[in-house]
Amino acid sequence: VIGGDEXDINEHRSLALMYXSWSHRFIXXGXLI
């Protein structure tokens, strides 16, 4: 169970980082435009 929880946390963290990175690029591009 613990291993499964860690995997879920890692997946959520990866998705969060990808989303934050994408939104940051989108905002920066919008500001430049």
UniProtKB/Swiss-Prot annotation:
Family (UniProt): Belongs to the peptidase S1 family. Snake venom subfamily.
Keyword Hydrolase in annotation: yes
UniProt GO cellular component terms: extracellular region
Domain called Peptidase S1: residue spans: 1-33
Keyword Hydrolase: yes
Catalytic activity: Selective cleavage of Arg-|-Xaa bond in fibrinogen, to form fibrin, and release fibrinopeptide A. The specificity of further degradation of fibrinogen varies with species origin of the enzyme
Keywords: Blood coagulation cascade activating toxin, Hemostasis impairing toxin, Hydrolase, Protease, Secreted, Serine protease, Toxin
Coiled coil regions, renumbered to chain: none
Function, as annotated: Thrombin-like snake venom serine protease that displays clotting activity on fibrinogen. Shows both arginine-ester hydrolase and amidase activities on synthetic substrates. Also shows proteolytic activity toward casein.
Subunit structure: Homodimer.
UniProt-recorded Gene Ontology molecular function terms: serine-type peptidase activity; toxin activity
Location(s) in or outside the cell: Secreted
EC number of the protein: 3.4.21.74
Protein's name in the database: Thrombin-like enzyme RP34
GO terms under biological process: proteolysis
Enzyme category, top tier: hydrolase
Tissue specificity as recorded in UniProt: Expressed by the venom gland.
